[in-house]
UniProtKB/Swiss-Prot annotation:
This is GCN5-related N-acetyltransferase 9. Signal peptide: none annotated. Its EC number is 2.3.1.48. The gene is GNAT9. PROSITE patterns: GNAT. Oligomer. Probable protein acetyltransferase with dual specificity triggering both N-alpha-acetylation (NTA) and epsilon-lysine acetylation (KA). Expressed throughout the plant. It comes from Arabidopsis thaliana. Belongs to the acetyltransferase family. GNAT subfamily. Keywords: Acyltransferase, Cytoplasm, Nucleus, Transferase. It comes from the Eukaryota. It is an enzyme of class 2 (transferase).
Length: 218
């Protein structure tokens, strides 16, 4: 059986580039995950490097998940050809999960800006918006959710500024769930955002990855 990666496109915005999570990224990602503050903020458990490689492989092969590494364009060296990991510019990751058993068009969004040098520059906001636009255009997502620990005030502030509203709270997990229904107006705004996103790709057997505007083939 041939295994297909779920994501075969890189998305270039004004300040960030979203690239598929590659094996070359794993050592740096593993280094981030040694930070107890990041583990708490993301609700993650520490993994060994070997487990991190296994996780990377499972994420990239999961048809119900899209995972991108966030690159800070200020630190990218060389060309932005698709397939180049640009580890030197890694700053975080952004994901969407289609894990609602009752509605496959609902997606949970996660964002992490791990590098202190890249915080406070609006990279998290731009990454989330590009990911949401990607989800609406490619995957026909009609509602986004975000689950955020109550102590993660930065993420709560970001998602609320984007228009997410609280839908529930878990006292056991001390976690807030926020929702963002994709109304017609919001869909138009997200799709308009794609006009400014450059898509870097190579040939893919996944039709849903060929629907973005501004293509640059590499």
């Amino acid at each position: 059986m041939v295994t297909r990666m779920a994501t075969k496109v890189s998305l270039e915005g004004k300040r960030v580039v979203l690239v598929p999570y590659m094996a070359e990224h794993v050592p740096k990602y593993h280094q981030w995950m040694q930070d107890s503050a990041l583990l708490e903020a993301t609700g993650s458990e520490p993994l060994s490097l070997e487990q991190e490689y296994e996780m990377q492989l499972s994420w990239t092969q999961d048809p119900n998940k899209r995972t991108f590494i966030v690159l800070d364009k200020d630190f990218v060296k060389g060309d932005l050809a698709h397939g180049q990991p640009h580890v030197e510019a890694m700053t975080g990751d952004v994901n969407i999960y289609m894990n609602d058993v009752d509605d496959p068009k609902v997606a949970e969004v996660e964002i992490m800006i791990a590098e202190p040098r890249s915080r406070g520059k609006g990279l998290g906001k731009e990454s989330v918006l590009i990911m949401m636009a990607y989800g609406v255009k490619n995957l026909e997502i009609h509602k986004f959710t975000a689950k955020i620990g109550e102590s993660n005030t930065a993420s709560l502030s970001l998602f609320r500024k984007l228009g997410f509203e609280e839908s529930s709270y878990s006292g056991i997990f001390k976690e807030v769930t926020l929702e963002y229904p994709v109304t017609n107006l919001r869909r138009e705004e997200l799709l308009k955002l794609l006009d400014e996103v450059i898509r870097h790709t190579h040939s893919s057997n996944n039709p849903s990855d060929s629907l973005l505007s501004g293509e640059a083939t590499a």
